Amino acid sequence: MWLADNWKDYEVLDTSAGEKLERWGKYILVRPDPQVIWNTPKDDPLWRKYDARYARSSTGGGKWQNLRLPAQWQVRYKELTFQVKPMNFKHTGVFPEQAANWDFMMETIRRAGRPIRVLNLFAYTGGATIACAAAGASVCHVDAAKGMVLWAKENTKASGLEDRPIRWIVDDCAKFVEREIRRGKTYDAIIMDPPSYGRGPSGEVWKLEENLYPFVELVSRVLSDDPLFFIINSYTTGLAPSVMRYLTETLVAKKYGGSTQSDELGLPVRDTGLALPCGATCRWTKERP
C-alpha cells in the first residue's frame, strides 16, 4: 500500500460504522466511507464534538449536519495549498490519499532534469496539476465541469503558482484527446482519475470497467517518444490494482518498456495505527539509463 503519511493539516483520527472522523486544519468532520465495514467502539471524544457531519439519506444522497464551518478554508501539503469547501455528496474538494501520488509526481519530474509536459485528465480541483506545476512541469488540466476547473485555478493561486504554464480546458476528456491526436500534440506524462460511472452531455454512458481499456488505448496515443510516467487512479471497488497493471502493461509498457507498479492508496488512522484503504493507483515509469 502507498500511504499518504506526510500530512500536517489533515489526518484520519478514527473510523467506525461506515464513517471516518477527520481533522481538516482546525475543523473536525465526520464523513461516510464505504470501506469502513467494522463497528469498533467510538471512544474518541471528537466523535461527539465534530464541526460538521455528512449524513446519508435512506432515499439516497444526504446532507451536512451541524455545519459549524466557514464556506471555505485552506489546508497545506508541503508547498501546495488547497481550498476546502464542503460540497454535496460528502466531498470537500481534496482527496488526501492522493498525496502519495503527488510526492511521486514531484520527485519524478524533478529528477528528469528536462522540460516535462503533463496531461491531467478528469483533473477535478487540480491536486496533481499543482503538484506537477510546483515541480516545474507544464500542465494541461482537463475536466468537463467548469466549476471544478475554476476551483483548480483557486488552488493554483493559493499555492503561488498562477504564473506557471498551465493550460485550462473545460471539455469531455475523450473528445479533447481525440483533437490532440489530430493536432499531433504529445505529452511526456499522463495522469487520469476517471469516474466509476457518469453521463456525458449527449447522454453517453461511462462505465469504468467497460470504457477504461479503450480510453487508455486512446490516451496512450498522445504519449511522446520519451515518456516519463503514466498514472491511472481508480475508486471503483471492483477494479483491482492488478487489473490496472495488466491493462497498463498491455497498452503502455509493451510499447515503451519501463516498469509498472500498482497498489492500494491508504491513509494512516491515528487512533488505531492502522491504514484506511482509499482506492488504487497504477504507475508506469520509463526507466532511464
Task: State each model region's role.
Residues 125-139:
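Conserved SAM-binding loop of SAM-dependent methyltransferases across substrates and taxa
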Residues 145-191:
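S-adenosyl-L-methionine
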Residues 173-253:
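S-adenosylmethionine
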Residues 227-289:
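C-terminal catalytic and target-recognition region of SAM-dependent MTase-like enzymes
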Residues 123, 143-147, 211:
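Short beta->alpha hinge that forms the Motif I/post-I loop of the SAM-binding pocket
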Residues 7-22, 29-96, 103:
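Non-catalytic substrate-recognition/targeting regions of SAM-dependent transferases
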Residues 96-114:
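Conserved alpha-helix/loop element of class I SAM-dependent methyltransferases that forms part
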Residues 114-124:
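Conserved class I S-adenosyl-L-methionine
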